[in-house]
Design a protein with these regions (language model features):
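TIR-domain catalytic/interaction hotspot
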Residues: 1-60
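Short hydrophobic alpha-helical runs that function as membrane-insertion/retention elements
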Residues: 15-17, 65-70
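Conserved nucleotide-binding/hydrolysis micro-motifs of P-loop NTPases
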Residues: 22, 73-75
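Catalytic cores of processing enzymes, dominated by hydrolases/peptidases
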Residues: 56, 64, 71-73
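C-terminal interaction surface of TIR/SEFIR-family domains
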Residues: 76-141
Length: 141
C-alpha cells in the first residue's frame, strides 16, 4: 500500500476501470445474516480486482478526483455501489455518476456519446483544479 500511496501523492486524479475478473458460478450474499438483512443470489455474477476498491478509496482520502467505470455484470458493492440520487440517476458512493460499460457493445460509440463527454469533461475539470491548487497552503475550511 505504501507504493500505491506514493504514486497517489504524485497524481492529480484517478481513473479506475472495474473489469470482470472472477465469476461466481453459484453463491449467496448475506446468508443466515444475524442483522436481519435479506440474503440475495450471487450466482453468475462477477467480481473485479480488489484494487478497484482500494485505490479509489485511497485517492478519495487524499482529495483526488476519482472516476470509476464498472463493466456490466460486476457486482456493485462497496465503492462500486450505486445509489439513486433523487433525480432518477444513479450515483456512486463517491457522489458522482458511475458509468457502466458493456464490452459486447461498440465502445467507440460510447466514447463519442454525450454522456461520456460530460463525464470526462467534469472529471478533467476536477483534475485541473487539483493541478491549480497544488503547492498552495492547505485550507481547513
Amino acid at each position: 500500500l505504501t507504493a500505491i500511496r506514493r504514486l497517489m501523492l504524485e497524481s492529480n486524479g484517478l481513473v479506475t476501470i472495474a473489469f470482470r475478473r472472477s465469476l461466481i458460478k453459484q453463491g449467496t450474499g448475506k446468508p443466515i445474516s444475524d442483522i436481519g438483512e435479506e440474503e440475495y443470489d450471487l450466482s453468475n455474477k462477477w467480481l473485479t480486482s480488489p484494487y478497484c476498491q482500494i485505490e479509489p478509496a485511497m485517492a478519495f482520502q487524499l482529495g483526488l478526483p476519482v472516476l470509476i467505470l464498472r463493466e456490466k455484470g460486476v457486482i456493485a458493492e462497496g465503492i462500486l455501489e450505486v445509489l439513486p440520487d433523487g433525480y432518477g440517476f444513479l450515483k456512486g458512493v463517491l457522489g458522482v455518476y458511475m458509468p457502466e460499460f458493456d464490452l459486447n457493445c461498440n465502445l467507440d460509440d460510447y466514447f463519442k456519446s454525450k454522456e461520456w463527454i460530460q463525464i470526462i469533461q467534469k472529471w478533467e475539470g476536477y483534475v485541473r483544479k487539483v493541478v491549480d491548487n497544488k503547492g498552495k497552503p492547505p485550507m481547513l475550511y
